[in-house]
Amino acid sequence: MDFELNEEQRMFRDSLRKFLDAEVRPLDDRWGDLEMTAERAKPLLKMLIPWGYADSEGILAGGSDPIIGCVQSEELSATFPGLSGMSGITSGAASLIAASAHPDLARRLVAPLSHADLIGCIATTEPEAGSDPSGIRSRAERKGDHWVINGAKTWISNGSVADIAVVLAQTDPAKGPLGFRHFVIDRRESPFDSREIQTIGLRSFPTSQMFFNDVEVPETNVLGGWSSERVSPERAFQRTLSLFSHARAGTGMMAVGIARRAYEIALKYVQIRKQFGKEIIRHQLVAAMVAEMATEIDAARLLCNRAYLALRRGRADVEASMAKWYATEAAVKVASTAIQCMGANGLATENRVERCLRDARMLTMPDGTTQIQKLIIGRALTGKSAIR
């Protein structure tokens, strides 16, 4: 396996990086640590469309080349991580709808989501069902030719700004996880309430509570079962688990980008800052910290690349969990080390690196905590579950 980018991939990366540095980085400086609105987000997302973001390929963008998808995610996350998250979630919703929705619904929604005319979200987590998705309590009841949905979701990315929500709900509690179905809720036609959750980091990547009170959707808004090529409705829970694997790989790659941003800021600083008559990079302990940061980033990137490649071949639960666990924890470690390299200056908000730490810390929780990832890996390696 060649661990270096090929010529086409390098050219894409270099062109994308040039565009992001010139056009998007100033926007991150202005809005990256502020609450995002739909009105502000849509023009920003539209800027990314020529580069393959927010398309119906979903989290693993990049067409036939998953490494291009890795490059896209890392570069945008290193530049404007909040926008990277919003783009990934919207494209994930578009991907689900494109693959499993009624053809009429797919024709109506996929293009607007892909063109950033609409923002999407995927609503799974609930107040009593975080790391354990089998505990979903939101109910969907059939009434004639439509469904009525009641329940609450929490910690939903894009939830407060989403026009389109893909919501997991229970249709038959007696069936357990086999009763789960995904429903597409168009907020313009079936309104629901939401509330922004204030967080320490990724403030421009909305995180929300969502409330569904007698929300009606037509039968055609149920995902799955519309042709022999589409996922059976009975497989909704397996689809949910597969979604988690894709999201974990994407979250891992976001972490790589954030870690790289912190590293680059610190690397520049230690080559300029002088103490005891020389640049601080020439002090052994500082040089060691720089080496550790670079190694952590490379290791995390390789794990994420492997997960992206594996997901293109099918289910890759272990690879995705390894990537998510290692990359997010590495990002926290790298950002903290970057602050240490810069001393008191690392604590100043004007130097940006402290936000890298706050942003990185946000990523160890979603899509299953670090501890849940380790349990998933352990179960796969031994065949024995430490969860149940």
Question: What residue ranges belong to the model's regions?
Answer:
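Amphipathic, small/basic residue-rich leader segments at the start of a protein or domain
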Residues: 1-88, 108, 112-115, 381-388
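Glycine-rich phosphate/cofactor-binding loops in nucleotide/flavin-utilizing enzymes
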Residues: 2, 71-72, 92, 233, ...
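Glycine-rich beta->alpha junctions and the first turn(s) of the following alpha-helix
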Residues: 3-5, 193-298, 363, 388
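N-terminal glycine-rich flavin-associated loop
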Residues: 84-104, 130
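A short core secondary-structure module
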Residues: 145, 150-195
